[in-house]
């Protein structure tokens, strides 16, 4: 493990059975002491934290080898302490983040050194692709998902093709591994194509 530089150092929160995407708002229930400590720390500062998925959800105290090397730099929008000692947080994904090093210096929680993966500039071709994604998703939703009506409205209000792809990816009925693959797919055109391909399979 390399030395973690302080300017890129962020608290790290490993997640079980969920992948967080940029521009998506998700509620999380957190119970592990280290995770709660990390959340308490970020609430004192800029409320930004790196959310990363565990490779095996059954590991209770995940180490470097137990988490993926790609996560999502996120912002805590709301934190609520529940009577049973757990915490409910509302998080918003901000950007893809490559985890370059994990630090165990602080015994209370993990932190990491990240490289932010900026979203690509949109092209006319990608905009057209994103619109066809929305149409495909809307058609699929009308067949089997009552709760997707609000999501379709949200998708139609978005202008950025990357945000459209990520919002759909977050709601796809696919494995955690497949969602992680989409998170790591930083090339926007390839990501739009892959999400469309998955929707095609779901529709067939």
Describe the residue ranges of each PLM region.
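N-terminal low-complexity, acidic/polar interaction/targeting segments
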Residues: 1-204
